[in-house]
Swiss-Prot record:
Summary of subunit composition and partner proteins: Part of the 50S ribosomal subunit. Forms a cluster with proteins L3 and L19. In the 70S ribosome, L14 and L19 interact and together make contacts with the 16S rRNA in bridges B5 and B8.
Name of the protein in question: Large ribosomal subunit protein uL14
Upper classification of the organism: Bacteria, Pseudomonadati, Campylobacterota, Epsilonproteobacteria, Nautiliales
Highest taxon above the source species: Bacteria
Purpose of the protein: Binds to 23S rRNA. Forms part of two intersubunit bridges in the 70S ribosome.
Family membership noted in the UniProt record: Belongs to the universal ribosomal protein uL14 family.
Transmembrane segments: none
Length: 122
């Protein structure tokens, strides 16, 4: 469950290391985002030679949350951290590698490229 001012790890090699959620996209009064949702975020920590710089406003898709997500079959899945992958206007990832496992729900939301780059899909 991600809301404004939540800080997330960046799970790709775009150059950003930590982002802070500014807005959850999808509805005027939408409060929370879960796995597979798109957020607008500000970059709080970044590598000095990366594509993304500190202070930049980016869009990102959430790939891991500490709050459990219920699946269609009734099972629950949760992760150790909150993480996101930075995307461009065409919903393609900016980075070329994804670090750590991602939830299967990301594929169902239409992010096949992110799923194919991930080392493990749970």
């Amino acid at each position: 469950m991600i809301q404004p001012f939540t800080r997330l790890k960046v799970a790709d090699n775009s150059g950003a290391k930590e982002i802070m959620c500014i807005k959850v996209l999808g509805g005027s009064k939408r409060r929370y985002a879960s796995v597979g949702d798109i957020i607008v975020a500000s970059v709080k920590k970044a590598l000095p030679n990366g594509k993304i710089k500190k202070g930049q406003v980016v869009k990102a898709v959430i790939v891991r949350t500490k709050k459990e997500v219920q699946r269609e079959n009734g099972s629950l899945i949760r992760f150790d951290d909150n993480a996101a992958v930075i995307i461009d206007a065409k919903k393609e990832p900016i980075g070329t590698r994804i670090f750590g496992p991602i939830a299967r729900e990301v594929r169902y939301e239409g992010f096949q490229k992110i799923t194919s780059l991930a080392p493990e899909v749970l």
